[in-house]
Amino acid sequence: MKVIAFGVREDEECFMDPVAKKLNIEVEIHTEHLNMETVHWAKGFDAVSIVGVCQADRDILKILSGYGIKALSTRTIGYDQIDLDAANEYGIKVANVSYSPDCVADFTILLMLALTRRFAHMLERSRCMDYSLHGIQGKEMHNLTVGIIGLGRIGSCVARDLKGFGCKIQ
């Protein structure tokens, strides 16, 4: 199987060759994103791998289908950038990466802590050797009421973890 990968970041490159060898597939790597100017590079391949900023709209998918592409994977959790109806119509299977909802929840809470404790302001001041407290005193999590829109896999993990901080969940 031959796969062309678009939008490959430097930190991804080191994983692609070992995985390709293990799976006995050929992978061609491009840092450029999939678009109307680069889609012709997919000619002669069996599958395409993209990232979130690559748009796989109806026009792109029609061209890929014409090249015989049977599979499209996105190296992201989200897949809004892919026209699923068109992919289905053109017989292109679509896949995305799995994820750990706990990992995403951890990052969400990291951002909440950074905001409530005014971490960016503290960091900026520390660069100037200013360690005064004026204007950087944050809020304590146990005093906060947090509204969560959507209690799916990630939202449920965030709610569970915030209870450990003593937050009121709405």
Regions found by a protein language model. Name each.
Residues 26-30, 95, 170:
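General small-molecule cofactor/ligand-binding pocket signal
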Residues 28-34, 52-53, 125-134:
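Short gly/ser/thr-rich secondary-structure transition/capping motifs
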Residues 45-123:
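Phosphate/diphosphate ligand-binding glycine-rich loop within oxidoreductases
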